[in-house]
């Protein structure tokens, strides 16, 4: 009986963890930022099962930014090749993230709204009166002061950067061999603020790639 009770408690504990790590009610649940929202869908602010607005994955539903070049971080010690961050319909992970995070497009600007008239128009302090991000999550349209993205990881090693772990050891974090926003951030899991893949306590996240 005692054993069964312990198992039940453990299951409740695990379920609690799973719930806490859900995108529902997280900062990526856009319903929490729109005060008169009557839409009940969570995923719709990024994804749609039909009539996607881009020609590539992942069934993207959010209007892409029309911003020009975002620029890229440069440094005398940077050996890798950085590709321009596109804002076209190519499905680039970084361009999808920036469609909200460059602060030029409202978070509820969708290609395929769930139901006409269900998206609210009053926003919380994280958004301005037009639904654009104004908090620290607004990275702006200049990425030259941010960690490099669209960086070819292997090219850094090939060109002599001995301060990086092997590309094979971090392959699960790379998309098309590149470092992107999603290399550090897990957009669907708010368990580790701010949506980090692993904790950065003791620089754990940084040391996943960097040898220091």
Whereabouts are the PLM-identified features?
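Positively charged n-region of N-terminal signal peptides that target proteins for export
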Residues: 1-4
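C-type cytochrome heme-c attachment and multiheme electron-transfer modules
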Residues: 6, 12, 16-44, 48-212
């Amino acid at each position: 009986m005692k054993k069964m009770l312990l198992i039940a408690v453990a299951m409740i504990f695990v379920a609690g963890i799973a719930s806490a790590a859900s995108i529902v009610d997280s900062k990526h649940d856009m319903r929490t930022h729109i005060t008169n929202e009557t839409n009940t869908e969570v995923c719709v602010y990024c994804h749609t099962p039909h009539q996607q607005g881009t020609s590539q994955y992942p069934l993207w539903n959010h209007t892409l930014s029309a911003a020009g070049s975002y620029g890229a971080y440069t440094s005398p010690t940077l050996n890798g090749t950085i590709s321009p961050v596109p804002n076209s319909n190519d499905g680039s992970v970084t361009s999808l993230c920036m469609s909200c995070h460059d602060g030029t497009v409202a978070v509820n600007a969708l290609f395929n709204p769930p139901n006409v008239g269900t998206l609210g128009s009053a926003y919380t302090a994280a958004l301005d009166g037009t639904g654009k991000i104004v908090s620290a999550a607004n990275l702006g349209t200049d990425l030259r002061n941010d960690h490099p993205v669209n960086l070819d990881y292997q090219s850094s090693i090939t060109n002599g950067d001995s301060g990086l772990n092997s590309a094979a050891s971090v392959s699960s974090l790379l998309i098309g061999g590149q470092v992107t926003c999603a290399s550090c951030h897990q957009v669907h899991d708010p368990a580790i603020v701010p949506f980090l893949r692993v904790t950065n306590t003791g620089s754990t996240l940084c040391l996943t790639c960097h040898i220091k």
